[in-house]
């Protein structure tokens, strides 16, 4: 595999290979065994982030350094892009500095694919517009596989702004490929029109969706949706679709809850639900476990793509 642009069309075997290697890296990361695993020693990796990021950027940087690679941090605001240089010219200049791989985050859908077609170096999509965010989905899938043991037949409900979410799209592609059942729930104005061709269920009532689900992935609500005509108000969204203890108590079953972060407390998820990492209660927050798993998954992706023969 030359690039990781998205999970759409990726074979189940390729996804499982990443997850299996991530399990190895998580063990090493947690136990601090051989903290530096130099399979990418001498490689240069450019983190070209045209959008702000905390978890994704830092976890990729930790992953690269744990593999012995050098990282170059690129900021659009302080680069020649601010002087009018095109994105492709910027990439070509970094190529001339013997960069081996690009990790790209960009607000435009399709940008990572365009760069992948313009360079012979490795390209990893760290989120492009509303299209895909493959490594976020991979770490979500890894978290769920750790929790359930297998994803075959597991019912996963994705809650929130599906229409604009690259995280939702990548999760739908990856989860269904591995045999999970997927449903989405949210306001009609924030659901895409093409859900039927994706082979997923649609719920308009959160209580019904929670009763169906084995696990929930809650998406961050972009606050501008309330002023963009998509929602009556944030308060209305929170009342109808916010994940709270009161809602979870109605279903009387234990539910792992995931969220890609950052969270809007008391809007899409209550503080109690976000912070509960163990019983008692009817939910278990996986949010911090996802962050740890993000380092492991991104380490696996870098190693499998860039190292010709990863150490075993």
Swiss-Prot record:
It comes from the Bacteria. PROSITE patterns: CARBAMOYLTRANSFERASE. Pfam families: OTCace, OTCace_N. Disulfide bonds: none annotated. L-aspartate binds at residues 83, 166, 220. It is an enzyme of class 2 (transferase). GO terms for molecular function: amino acid binding; aspartate carbamoyltransferase activity. Heterododecamer (2C3:3R2) of six catalytic PyrB chains organized as two trimers (C3), and six regulatory PyrI chains organized as three dimers (R2). It catalyses: carbamoyl phosphate + L-aspartate = N-carbamoyl-L-aspartate + phosphate + H(+). This is Aspartate carbamoyltransferase catalytic subunit. Gene3D superfamilies: Aspartate/ornithine carbamoyltransferase. One of its GO terms (biological process) is 'de novo' pyrimidine nucleobase biosynthetic process. It comes from Prosthecochloris aestuarii (strain DSM 271 / SK 413). Carbamoyl phosphate binds at residues 55-56, 105, 133, 136, 261-262.
């Amino acid at each position: 595999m030359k690039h990781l642009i998205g999970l759409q069309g990726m074979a189940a075997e390729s996804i499982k290979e990443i997850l299996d290697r991530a399990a190895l890296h998580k063990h090493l990361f947690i136990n601090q065994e051989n903290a530096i695993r130099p399979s990418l020693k001498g490689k240069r990796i450019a983190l070209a982030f045209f959008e702000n990021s905390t978890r994704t950027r830092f976890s990729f940087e930790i992953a690269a350094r744990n593999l012995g690679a050098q990282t170059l941090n690129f900021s659009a605001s302080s680069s020649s892009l601010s002087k009018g240089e095109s994105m492709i010219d910027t990439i070509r200049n970094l190529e001339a500095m013997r960069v081996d791989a690009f990790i790209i985050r960009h607000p435009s859908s399709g940008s990572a694919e365009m760069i992948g077609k313009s360079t012979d170096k490795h390209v990893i999509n760290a989120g492009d517009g509303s299209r895909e965010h493959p490594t976020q989905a991979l770490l979500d899938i890894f978290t769920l596989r750790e929790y359930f043991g297998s994803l075959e037949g597991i019912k996963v409900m994705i809650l929130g702004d599906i229409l604009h979410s690259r995280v939702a799209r990548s999760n739908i592609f990856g989860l269904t490929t591995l045999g999970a059942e997927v449903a989405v729930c949210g306001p009609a104005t924030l659901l895409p029109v093409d859900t039927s061709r994706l082979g997923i269920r649609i719920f308009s009532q959160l209580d019904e969706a929670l009763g169906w689900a084995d696990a929930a992935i809650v998406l961050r609500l972009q606050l501008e949706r309330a002023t963009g005509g998509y929602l009556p108000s944030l308060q209305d969204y929170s009342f109808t679709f916010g994940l709270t203890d009161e809602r979870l108590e109605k279903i009387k079953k234990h539910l792992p809850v995931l969220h890609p972060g950052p969270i809007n407390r008391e809007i899409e998820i209550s503080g109690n639900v976000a912070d509960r990492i163990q019983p008692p209660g009817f939910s278990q927050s996986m949010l911090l476990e996802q962050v740890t798993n993000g380092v492991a998954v991104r380490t696996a992706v870098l190693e499998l793509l860039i190292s010709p023969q990863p150490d075993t």
